[in-house]
C-alpha cells in the first residue's frame, strides 16, 4: 500500500476538474460572450499596448549594445569561445572581455553574466553574429516562443477565448514585459516556456518530468527554486522533487564542465559582490516586487536598515500564507491554480526581479481570467481581478504621458498584490467533484 504522502495517494472523493478530450478544455464551458463593441475595444487596447511596447523595443535595436542586455550573454559566449571559461565568474575577466567586444562599456558600466554557465549553450547559435543581427535573430526566436507558449496555454484559456474571441498570443504580445524581452535580448520567455511545460507535464500525471523540466529553468535559480518549493515540496510530490534534483544535477554538471572547479568558489562570490560592484543593475525601484515597492515608498522616511526588516516581514507573511494554504489544501487542487499562486508568490517575495522576469505573470493572469470567465468568482472578486489586470496591462500605455513610470516598475507590485489575493482566493476553493 502506498504511503499517505506519496504521489499516488490522492483520496478518491476529491478529483481534478473534468476535461474533455478536445484540447483539454473544461467540460462545462461558459456560454457568455462579450458584446462585439467590448471585444473590439479589448482587441484595440491590446494592439495599442503591443505597438507602444514594440516602439520601445525598436529603440534597443537601433541604439547598440549599451542599451540592451544581450551584451551580457555575448560576453559570456566570447569568454567560452576564447578559452576563458574558467574565469567566467570573475569581474575583472568579464570586464576585459566586454570592453574588448564593446569599447563603450567603461562609460555605460559593466553588465556581467551571472547565471549558471549552461545557459550560454542556448545562446550559442548567435555567438558569431554581429551584435545587431544577433539581437534581431534572438527577437525572432522569442517571437516564436511566444506563439508556442500561447498554444501550450490553450487548455487553460478555453473560457477566456470563448468570452472574448481573442487569441492567446495577442494577450501575450499585448503585455509589456513580453515585448520588452525582444528588445533586451533576454531569456525570460525561455523561463516561462519551461514553467508552462512543467505545468502541462504535471497535468498529465508526469510528475518526474514536471520536476526535471522546471530544473532546466535554474538559470534563474532563485525563481525556479521558490516555485519548486511551492508546487512540489509542499504538496509532497516526491517524484517531481526527484526530477527536479536530477535536472538540477544535470545543469550544474554542464556548468562545471564549462567553468571547472572554480564554479564552487567564484560563482557565490560574484553573487555576493555584484550589488556592490555593479549597483546600476540593482536599482530597487525598477523591480516589480515588494522589495522595489517598499524601498521606493519608504526611502524618504526611513533608512535602508529600517526598510529591510519591513520587506522581510511582509515577504514572510505573504510567503507563509501561500505555503500554509498549499499545505492545508493538499491534495485536491488542480495544477493550474497551484502554479498560479506559486508564481505570484515568487514574484512578490523575490529579492531580485527585473521587468523582463514579469513575463511569467502571464500564466496566472490568463488562468485567473479563465476561471472568472467560467463563473468561479463573485462579482467583487472579478472586479478586483480586472483592476489588477488593467493595472498590469495599462502600465506601458500610461507611461506614454507619464514617462517617469518607465523607471518606477516597482509600482507594478500593487496590481500584482491584488492578483495574488485573487489567486489565493481561487486556490482556497475546492474544485468541483465529478460524480
Question: What are the language-model segments listed below?
Answer:
Residues 214-231, 350-357:
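Transmembrane helices and adjacent periplasmic/lumenal helix-loop junctions
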Residues 195-200, 221-222, 251, 273-276, ...:
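Alpha-helical transmembrane segments and their membrane-interface exit regions
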Residues 219-222, 250-254, 380-383:
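Membrane-embedded alpha-helical segments of transport systems
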Residues 369-435:
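Aromatic-enriched
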Residues 217, 260-261, 275-277, 390-396:
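A general structural signal for short secondary-structure boundary/capping elements
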Residues 2-4, 13, 19-209, 232-362, ...:
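Primarily membrane-embedded glycan-assembly and transfer machineries that use lipid-linked glycans
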Amino acid at each position: 500500500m502506498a504511503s499517505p504522502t506519496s504521489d499516488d495517494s490522492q483520496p478518491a472523493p476529491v478529483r481534478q476538474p473534468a476535461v474533455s478530450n478536445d484540447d483539454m478544455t473544461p467540460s462545462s464551458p461558459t456560454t457568455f460572450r462579450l458584446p462585439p463593441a467590448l471585444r473590439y475595444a479589448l482587441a484595440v487596447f491590446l494592439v495599442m499596448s503591443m505597438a507602444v511596447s514594440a516602439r520601445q523595443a525598436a529603440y534597443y535595436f537601433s541604439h547598440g549594445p549599451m542599451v540592451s542586455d544581450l551584451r551580457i550573454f555575448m560576453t559570456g559566449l566570447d569568454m567560452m569561445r576564447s578559452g576563458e571559461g574558467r574565469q567566467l565568474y570573475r569581474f575583472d575577466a568579464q570586464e576585459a572581455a566586454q570592453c574588448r567586444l564593446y569599447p563603450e562599456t567603461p562609460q555605460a558600466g559593466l553588465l556581467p553574466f551571472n547565471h549558471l554557465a549552461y545557459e550560454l549553450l542556448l545562446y550559442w547559435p548567435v555567438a558569431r553574429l554581429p551584435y545587431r543581427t544577433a539581437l534581431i535573430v534572438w527577437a525572432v526566436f522569442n517571437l516564436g516562443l511566444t506563439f508556442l507558449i500561447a498554444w501550450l496555454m490553450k487548455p487553460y484559456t478555453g473560457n477566456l477565448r470563448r468570452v472574448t474571441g481573442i487569441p492567446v498570443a495577442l494577450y501575450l504580445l499585448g503585455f509589456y514585459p513580453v515585448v520588452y524581452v525582444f528588445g533586451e535580448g533576454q531569456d525570460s520567455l525561455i523561463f516561462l516556456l519551461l514553467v508552462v511545460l512543467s505545468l502541462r507535464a504535471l497535468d498529465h500525471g508526469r510528475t518526474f518530468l514536471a520536476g526535471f523540466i522546471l530544473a532546466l529553468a535554474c538559470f534563474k535559480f532563485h525563481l525556479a527554486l521558490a516555485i519548486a518549493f511551492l508546487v512540489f515540496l509542499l504538496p509532497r510530490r516526491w517524484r517531481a522533487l526527484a526530477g527536479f534534483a536530477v535536472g538540477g544535477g544535470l545543469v550544474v554538471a554542464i556548468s562545471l564542465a564549462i567553468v571547472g572547479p572554480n564554479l564552487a568558489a567564484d560563482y557565490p562570490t560574484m553573487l555576493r559582490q555584484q550589488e556592490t560592484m555593479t549597483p546600476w543593475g540593482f536599482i530597487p525601484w525598477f523591480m516589480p516586487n515588494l522589495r522595489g515597492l517598499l524601498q521606493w515608498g519608504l526611502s524618504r522616511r526611513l533608512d535602508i536598515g529600517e526598510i529591510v526588516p519591513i520587506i522581510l516581514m511582509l515577504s514572510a507573511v505573504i510567503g507563509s500564507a501561500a505555503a500554509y494554504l498549499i499545505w492545508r489544501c493538499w491534495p485536491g487542487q488542480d495544477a493550474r491554480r497551484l502554479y498560479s499562486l506559486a508564481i505570484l508568490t515568487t514574484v512578490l517575495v523575490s529579492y531580485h526581479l527585473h521587468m523582463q522576469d514579469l513575463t511569467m505573470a502571464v500564466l496566472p493572469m490568463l488562468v485567473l481570467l479563465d476561471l472568472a470567465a467560467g463563473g468561479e468568482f463573485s462579482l467583487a472578486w472579478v472586479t478586483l481581478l480586472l483592476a489588477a489586470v488593467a493595472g498590469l496591462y495599462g502600465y506601458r500605455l500610461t507611461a506614454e504621458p507619464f514617462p517617469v513610470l518607465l523607471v518606477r516598475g516597482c509600482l507594478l507590485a500593487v496590481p500584482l498584490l491584488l492578483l495574488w489575493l485573487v489567486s489565493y482566493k481561487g486556490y482556497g476553493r475546492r474544485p468541483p467533484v465529478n460524480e
